[in-house]
Amino acid sequence: MEEEVENKTEKEDKEEHYLIVDDEVELNTHQRINKELCGSVVELSEGYAKVEFPTTKEMAVDNMGLIHGGFTFGAADFAAMAAVNEPNVVLVSSECRFLSPVKVGETVVFEAKERYHESRKRRIHVIGKFKDIKVFEGDFLAVVLDRHIFKLKLIKDEEE
């Protein structure tokens, strides 16, 4: 399996992560995210994303099947970033509420809607539901950068 991954061409790798949900909107961010850990975008439009997040036994913290909140948060974060849908979007902060426990085997659906869009700043509201039960609600603040965050000079050199 590992050998197969290494032998993929860059084009094949890109195609695997490339997603067009309708004729006009394509996913431009988080294209290499692990869908098994963070879910998959199933709907995408300007300022909106829907992510389906099927939970697995590897995410459980105990024998009862309780899913660790970090996995739930990761899927919500992915939905928020997909709603912004800019290549260099980064999360700045979040205020989240875990409203009901998530159990192994449940598929949580996250809907993310951009609520505020001014210049580089974006506020995104995310709701996660299992069936009709709201399990997560959060507000995310993101910033869209000119280039990848690792290519920015964030601090002055000590020599200056």
Task: List each language-model region with its residue ranges.
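A structural signal for short, well-ordered beta-strand segments
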Residues: V51, S94-F98, A112, V126, ...
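A generic structural signal for short beta-strands and their flanking turns/coil linkers
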Residues: K35-L37, G47-A49, V90-S94, E106-V108, ...
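Non-catalytic linker/capping segments at the edges of enzyme domains
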Residues: M1-E58, L154-E160
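Non-catalytic surface loops within mature trypsin-like serine protease
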Residues: T55-K57, S100, V144-D146
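A conserved, well-ordered hydrophobic junction motif at loop->secondary-structure transitions
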Residues: K50, E58-G74
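A short, polar/proline- and glycine-enriched secondary-structure boundary/capping micro-motif
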Residues: V61-G65, V92, R147-H148
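Hydrophobic beta-strand-centered segment that forms part of the acyl-chain substrate-binding groove
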Residues: F78-E114
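HotDog/MaoC-like acyl-thioester-processing domains
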Residues: E2-I20, N88, K103-V104, R115-E160
